[in-house]
């Protein structure tokens, strides 16, 4: 594993067929924060803008797995999107992070944060929060 530049950001994404949730780590890489939810093409533009503004040290991608921990139908779609990221951004380090239960965890966190029930079920808000859950899991695991 390579050393990460201390200035560049670590970004987390939750890839779906209609939306991509994006989260960004703070400069110290202690906390993940939702950045937004975007259409897949728009998310590539957002990632390019983040790269141009702050640099991106690594993109942490939510990796869809079955209950048993094996690849599932959505895994192929996520793999294809990672290739699109590499085409758009050039050389970028990509890490996979198990995304099982991240949407449920995101909804719980939104509830605990006092977000109203309709807001907790807004798919865009949940996708951005799920990206933050994915990224926070990576940050916690890698220290």
Swiss-Prot record:
Location(s) in or outside the cell: Cytoplasm
Alphabetically ordered keywords of this record: Cytoplasm, Hydrolase, Nuclease, Ribosome biogenesis
Stored Pfam families: RuvX (PF03652)
The keyword Nuclease is assigned to this record: yes
Gene Ontology CC: cytosol
Keyword Hydrolase tagged: yes
GO MF annotation: an example: nuclease activity
GO biological process assignments: rRNA 5'-end processing
EC number: 3.1.-.-
Cleaved signal peptide residues: none
InterPro entries in the record: RNaseH-like_sf, YqgF, YqgF/RNaseH-like_dom, YqgF/RNaseH-like_dom_sf
Family per record: Belongs to the YqgF nuclease family.
Primary role: Could be a nuclease involved in processing of the 5'-end of pre-16S rRNA.
PANTHER family per the UniProt record, alphabetical: POLYNUCLEOTIDYL TRANSFERASE, RIBONUCLEASE H-LIKE SUPERFAMILY PROTEIN
Protein name per its UniProtKB record: Putative pre-16S rRNA nuclease
Lineage: Bacteria, Pseudomonadati, Rhodothermota, Rhodothermia, Rhodothermales
